[in-house]
Amino acid sequence: RQFRTRGATESIVCAVEAARERARAERSVTEPEIVLAESAHAAFHKGAHLFGLRTRMVPVTDDWTVDLDAMADAVGPNTALVVASAPQYPQGVVDPVAEIAELAAGVGASCHVDACMGGFVLPFASIEEPDAWGSPPWDLAVEGVTSISADLHKLGYAPKGASVILHRSRRLRRYQTFDFDGWLGGRYVTPNLQGTRSGLPMAAAWAVVRHLGTDGYRRLVRSAIETADRI
């Protein structure tokens, strides 16, 4: 259910494309929109620019999470994608993912969780400090979340050029794939924006993940938590 990409931007842009294709195929949406907080990563706007979606930005509240009332007002029949961040980049705050996913599901839209920063932190923070650092459910355990992105080359500690996008199902994943057989060269199928890709970044990421393992990531997250507490 996952595809490998070269970084957060590519993972996010692929999520935008998949959401647009799903909205077209399943709901006949012709003027697709993305609903996202003003704190969401700029790559969502890049994806909207590349794939012809309108963005509907909503404000954040005093605690830097998305204003759910404003988001509910922005979601509608043209919504292809609703965005949650875990965490968002500017302040490091996790959005209320369950509530956002519910808004998306209410109109049949996709919900992408940008966990490019938190994907290799939140699972282990919840183990180490469940009361102080644990977060409400933010991943595919949340009904209505259709895809997640996580960067191996950020707090997964792998070399640059390694990210993943994980879809809830194979059915949803196929909306990300470009499949074309209308030319003289045969079938052309790509799961992301690139054609030819090097396997080196993912081989290096695999080695790092195997080396660190669950215990290694727990130690690193514990160290980060202790440092944050001291600061």
Regions found by a protein language model. Name each.
Residues 24-78:
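PLP-dependent aminotransferase-like
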Residues 131-231:
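Active-site C-terminal subdomain of aminotransferase-like
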Residues 68-70, 94-106, 118-147:
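Active-site pre-lysine segment of PLP-dependent enzymes
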Residues 14-17, 45-50, 93-96, 121-128, ...:
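Short acidic, glycine/serine/threonine-rich loops at helix termini
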Residues 66-115:
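Active-site phosphate-binding strand-loop segment of PLP-dependent enzymes
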Residues 1-28, 43-47:
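Conserved beta-loop-alpha segment that forms the PLP phosphate-binding cup at the N-terminus of a helix
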Residues 40, 88, 117-119, 154:
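Active-site-proximal loop/turn and secondary-structure-junction residues that shape catalytic pockets
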